[in-house]
Design a protein with these regions (language model features):
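Short, internal strand/loop/helix patches
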Residues: 93-126
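Solvent-exposed loop/turn segments at secondary-structure junctions
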Residues: 49-53, 80-84, 108-111, 137
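N-terminal "domain-start" segment that seeds a small globular fold
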Residues: 15-36
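Short active-site neighborhood of thiol/selenol oxidoreductases, capturing the structured segment around
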Residues: 37-53
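Loop/turn elements at helix/coil->beta-strand transitions in domains of secreted/extracellular proteins
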Residues: 38-43, 71-74, 99-101
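Thiol-/selenol-based redox modules, centered on thioredoxin-like
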Residues: 126-164
Length: 164
């Protein structure tokens, strides 16, 4: 019995630790890293936090779409919480069923500077979702994004549509 309990605890700790390791520190310059890694490709950048009322709904919806449109849909999550919140963030995201989505968390004592680097007109309200086309022109939505909008954006930004 103790052996089984130990194995269960070890498995739980390992799963949580590996989830935590997949969350990157978002610092000055991180936005450019995210953009550079996706040069010429469309993607969705979602800013959220643990206290956000609408974020669970949006994140679950995006996760379902990610499963449906595996290759066409690239989603990056950035939490505006702090590094101290990483274990909670990993647990929360996992509870939404999210497994293979790139994740970041604000890692600055001055989050205002990070927000300014991302968007000079953003004051921290979440959810805030940026839809980048292949040329990295963006559409910004604040508040809950409807599934219909995301599906239309996907249709407009399929990799095949770049071949004209």
């Amino acid at each position: 019995m103790i052996k089984h309990l130990f194995l269960l605890l070890l498995l739980t700790f390992t799963t949580t630790a590996s989830s935590v390791e997949n969350i990157h520190s978002f610092t000055a310059g991180s936005m450019n890293k995210i953009l550079s890694a996706r040069e010429g490709r469309p993607f969705i950048l979602v800013f959220w936090n643990l206290d956000c009322q609408y974020c669970p709904t949006e994140l679950k919806m995006l996760n379902k779409l990610k499963q449906q449109y595996r290759k066409e849909l690239d989603v990056v999550l950035v939490s505006t919480d702090t590094l101290d919140d990483v274990p909670q963030l990993a647990s929360r995201v996992k509870s939404y069923g999210i497994r293979k989505i790139e994740q970041w968390v604000f890692a600055s004592s001055m989050p205002e500077q990070l927000r300014f680097e991302i968007d000079k007109r953003w004051y921290g309200e979440v959810p805030r979702t940026h839809f980048y086309n292949p040329a990295h022109e963006r559409i910004v939505k604040t508040g809950l994004v409807e599934k219909k909008f995301v599906e239309q954006w996907l249709a407009d930004n399929k990799p095949e549509s770049k071949l004209h």
